[in-house]
Design a protein with these regions (language model features):
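Short beta-strand-loop/turn "lid" adjacent to the catalytic site in phosphate-handling enzymes
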Residues: 50-105, 141-153, 184-195, 199, ...
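Gly/Thr-rich phosphate-binding beta-strand-loop-beta motif of the actin/hexokinase/Hsp70
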Residues: 1-29, 116, 122-144, 160, ...
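A polyampholytic, Gly/Pro-enriched intrinsically disordered region
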Residues: 103-114, 168-173, 178, 261-265
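Adenine-nucleotide phosphate-binding core of ATP-dependent small-molecule kinases
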Residues: 32, 176-219, 240-242
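N-terminal glycine/serine-rich phosphate-binding loop of ATP-dependent small-molecule kinases
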Residues: 1-93, 265
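Phosphate-binding/catalytic loop of phosphoryl-transfer enzymes
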Residues: 83-85, 91-164, 195-210
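Glycine-rich phosphate-binding/hydrolytic loop that grips phosphoryl groups
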Residues: 165, 235, 241-265
């Protein structure tokens, strides 16, 4: 854990939104999101810089899947904090990677794996439900082994609308696991198909991964759900697993502890 009580900044830069969190002792004190495009635009910077005014921050740890904004973001961030750590597969310390092409692993997925290992133990599975659904698997020894990438809920709903003439566009926010599996209208039928199909896809993939892990280890497997759509599945069979909305930010917090020499683990 952290030897001092200074807060620091964690930032998860995604394709559409960047998520900010001010963290102290692995507790998130404040968090907010801004469009990722604003990080690479000098005219839009104040939308996130204003939130940091007056904050005493020991540094920043961030991950990014939008490399085009990183340079401008770091340039302006360096005026606020002096210690900036950009998490990637080459400098990560919170986990060990056993993967043929580690540079292909999304940095947010690495942060999730760090959080899962340290908060829930290994072997571990992290299921992140965003634009895409990703599974990240850690062995009993704590090695990052690989995972699964599948379509997310918003891709399902958009694809039905884009590839047909008569099916309407339904926001992913309106989809949930249905009480009845018989839709009484086109929209209701689509909601059943997407909601039930989404949950079924994830449950099926999870079952297969659990079976493979249990064949290689007798230890209990921790399963953690995160991502914008994870809350929708708390009504399904997945409700028995851990749910952490801010898993990526917490993973960045733990990685910052490993990287910062002024902290004691």
């Amino acid at each position: 854990m952290i030897a001092n009580s200074e807060s620091f900044l964690a930032v998860d830069i995604g394709n559409t939104h960047a998520h900010f969190g001010i963290i102290n002792q692995r507790k998130i004190l404040d968090q907010w999101s801004v469009p990722t495009s604003s990080l690479g635009d000098d005219l839009s910077l104040w939308s996130w810089q204003d939130k940091l005014k007056g904050k005493k921050l020991s540094g920043c740890c961030y991950c990014s899947v939008a490399p085009s904004v990183n340079k401008v973001f770091e340039r302006h961030l360096s005026k606020i904090v002096k210690k900036i750590h950009h998490l990637n597969c080459r400098n990560i310390k919170g986990i060990k990677i056993q993967y043929p092409k580690p540079e292909e692993i999304g940095q947010d997925r690495l942060a999730n794996a760090v959080a899962a290992k340290n908060l829930y133990g290994c072997p571990a599975i992290v299921i992140d439900m965003g634009t895409a659904v990703t599974f990240d698997i850690l062995s009993a020894e704590g090695y990052y082994e690989g995972g699964i990438i599948a379509p997310g809920l918003s891709l399902m709903t958009h694809y039905l609308n884009e590839k047909t003439e008569l099916l309407p566009k339904i926001p992913a926010s309106e989809i949930e696991v249905p009480a009845s599996v018989i839709g009484k209208s086109t929209v209701a039928a689509m909601k059943v198909g997407c909601g039930l199909g989404y949950a079924g896809m994830i449950e099926s993939m999870l079952k297969a991964v659990l079976e493979e892990l249990r064949n290689s280890s007798q230890e209990k497997v921790s399963v953690t759900l995160t991502g914008g759509d994870a809350g929708k599945l708390l009504q399904s069979n997945l409700r028995v697993y851990d749910y952490e909305k801010s898993l990526t930010l917490l993973g960045l917090a733990i990685e910052f502890e490993h990287q910062d020499l002024t902290m004691v683990l």
